[in-house]
Amino acid sequence: PIVISSQILNRQDGMDEYHARPDDIEKTADPRQARKFADKVLIPEKDWHSDRRMILGFRTARSGMTLAVGADHEIITENEYAALIDTEPGMGKRVYRVEATQGRPIRIDKAVAYHTSRGVPVHELFDRVRRSLDRVREQGHNVYYDEQRAWLDDYWATADVEVEGAPTGIQQAVRWNLFQIAQASARADQLGIPAKGVTGSGYEGHYFWDTEVYVIPMLTYTHPRIAENALRFRVNTLPQARRRAKELSERGALFPWRTITGEEASAYYAAGTAQYHINADIVHAIMNHARATEDKTFLFRDAAPVLVETAR
């Protein structure tokens, strides 16, 4: 028999059903390396399952943000099989034990939905996850494959960089980095773009001035809507920047060196207070976006207070 196991797991709890523990992160002085959390970050609030679906709900310990994740499974095979599904706080699993035979394929269609919010309760996010998974069942997976392909075709039509005469590895590296930018920025949703994107835990998910200097210029010329969406993070966190300026006896606003919420997140005072160029980086990105798009709507309607406060 073949055993196929699909799990939703909060890995911070330490180990999965096979007792596999995430590697302990070596303690070093490297600021890029994320540390283990001393306390639990995701607090389980709710779990539920049916014959083919499992949903888990969490709340973050400090900020109170909510999260729900659900998975649907469908097995398609002529082989005999037994199925088990179960959930508990912080973990859900769907297990198939298939009596596999030669020439009879085993196919499992799986759909996963995530919903998160700063203020919506977990039970409401459960309903949103259910509706998302219901749509996948009704419409089929191919609809989403086609939508994803269309989005990526549009992205590469304007973002691709061809390196002529260079070794294959150079072209591959350039396109890999462009793909990572797409992953990290496409759904920033007026939040920042983490320094390590969505491919790792380095820098603990913090946003730096690198976004305005390196990432947003590229997006401004290729996908200005995504660039504007990322710039809105600075507009939305202007109140925190004003408070930071007062803490350092400055006028106007001082944007943080590294942040998630808009507050300075660095525990190293020297680095967190020395880099005054960050204000200029942000203003440069805003003005470059306005000039490149020849659209001053975002500048005058939303971003002007940032320019004023950083100039004081």
Regions inferred by a protein language model and the residue ranges of each:
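Substrate-binding groove/exosite segments of carbohydrate-active enzymes
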Residues: 142-291
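Acidic/polar, glycine-enriched structural segments that form the non-catalytic walls/loops
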Residues: 1-203
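Membrane-interfacial loop-to-helix junctions in multi-pass inner-membrane proteins
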Residues: 298-303
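Short, surface-exposed connector motifs at secondary-structure boundaries
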Residues: 294-295
